[in-house]
Amino acid sequence: MKRMQETSFLFGSKAFLEALDNQLQIKKVNLSDKHQKLLGLIKKRGLRYEMHSSQWFHQQFRHINHQEFVCVINPNQMLKTIEQLIQITDSKSTSTLVMLHEIQDPHNFGAILRTCMAAEVDGIIFKKHNQAPINSTVIRTSMGTVFYQNLVQVTNLSYAITTLQKHGFWTVATTLDERLKPKDYRQVDFDKRILLVGNEDKGLNALLLKNADLKVKIPMNPKLNSLNVSVAVGIILFGWKS
């Protein structure tokens, strides 16, 4: 299926409680005496935990807003397979998915996830390699929305596109290359669509562009070459919703 890194950190009690609400397995909880109120819940759940001093947290997680409460989880448990995503969307007459090609910046990844949640996207598909993993930065930037979304990690985006096309999805690729004659994104009128967006610097590769059913762009001031990828995703998704 898919493998991300084996561990990731959650910072703060809010993220911990969200993880419990979503029935995620927590490997260990590191906390200080200031979180005594949660110690009873931790013991009741039978979770492994360690008590640490404030100094320990500041040494281990320098420059991070750790709140003296850090959980260790396996992020792989948040992932679904492409088959599970198809099961979710097959019964829907309309559906929007987002597919990411090698997004490198975890802040961009997290911001995209947050936007996808707000825009009621049914699933986000991303690569196993050359892609920012789901880590503490992504979780924090997503404002915890990562826990509530259908996330699919694949080794081959082209295969995922072909599979989803067989289930009624049309692939809409973003590009800045005017030679490809991209249309205004507002002209898209597919009931089931995949928004395919590329790497922050290189965009989409030739194969993905070839496999796309339609190429689109965001009309903008000609003095501007491009937008931040997370901003572009937001503009298109909410443009489609309206």
Swiss-Prot record:
Keywords: Methyltransferase, Transferase. One of its GO terms (cellular component) is cytosol. Its EC number is 2.1.1.-. Pfam families: SpoU_methylase, SpoU_sub_bind. S-adenosyl-L-methionine binds at G198, I218, L227. It is an enzyme of class 2 (transferase). Belongs to the class IV-like SAM-binding methyltransferase superfamily. RNA methyltransferase TrmH family. This is Uncharacterized tRNA/rRNA methyltransferase MG252 homolog.
